[in-house]
Amino acid sequence: MLVDAYRALLARHPSAQLLVAPRHIERADAVEAMVRGRGLTVRRRSRIPQLDTAGEPRPHVVILDSRGELASVYREATVAFVGGTLVPIGGHNLLEPAFWAKPVLFGPYTDHCVEIANLLVQADGGRRVSTAEELTTQLVRLFDHPEECVRMGQAAQSMVQQNQGALQATIDAIDRQLVSVDANRSASCSPGSFPLMAGR
């Protein structure tokens, strides 16, 4: 779906570049093969010293195959499409691109971030898409109308700023619950059997 939408965008905006960040870096080979199979040029970020390497043809697609670069990519992006929202796995982090004042596009499955998704939609800092056609329409619209793209990104960032206090309150409440659970843990619960897991 994303590649189809990108190819349609290229027809109107030939300089547009797609940066893909697979959730599992070990999938980079499969993603690269799929992109090449669609007739697009592709490079891995780990093999490009700088994204704007002089003297080399600019690839259509760059696969982010190293950790810790997503924030810098969001900072330079025009629009962000957040994956993991096209299939029922709960969705990925919608706040990162919003923090960097980028319009946030995402699919219908946002179980892990329902409130954030709703707040983004209400602020018109984010939009839900369900099909390749809908994604294409939104991408083309935002590229065709940069002023709308900027306004939408600012709305996304404003939503994050307005809700920072609520986010901290939620984190504090979770911390209190964890302390309470730890203090009341059953004696039959051995060390390490109740792990706190955090992930993106």
Model-assigned labels for residue ranges:
Residues 1-200:
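Nucleotide-activated sugar donor-binding and catalytic core shared by glycosyltransferases
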